[in-house]
């Protein structure tokens, strides 16, 4: 019998939000969802906790004062019960996953990580590079490393400048 997942995959009025870390949702289900829903109905998102982007290791205070382990795949698990407690995955890492793990092109990854989430949130002046849109832009190198961040047309981060 069909279940809720099957309904979600075929219902065109629904947009699916996925954390593409391989922990929250199995990679095969991510790929199945991408193929069934298409780029306009899948948004790559994160439920990152304080300390997002932290390297693997054990930390105190990242999540509700609990001791947690950031795993190599950027999942966050509580110690000692090993419960999944969020992610240390950034939105940039979602973009990198779209390209590297799921084989999507740069424009497709931008749709998954920017255009579709902005549409879902009703942010009609964001999510794409076009005239009249907010100039919120990240610049990446060929290896998809962050080189520059521009918010509302102002450079707020440059990888080649010392950070305060």
Label each residue range with its predicted role.
Residues 3-22, 29-46, 50-133, 137-140:
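His/Asp/Glu-enriched, well-ordered alpha-helical/loop segment
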Residues 23-24, 49-50, 144-145, 156:
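Short, glycine-/Ser/Thr-/acidic-enriched flexible segments
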Residues 119, 128-164:
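C-terminal cap of metal-dependent C-N hydrolases
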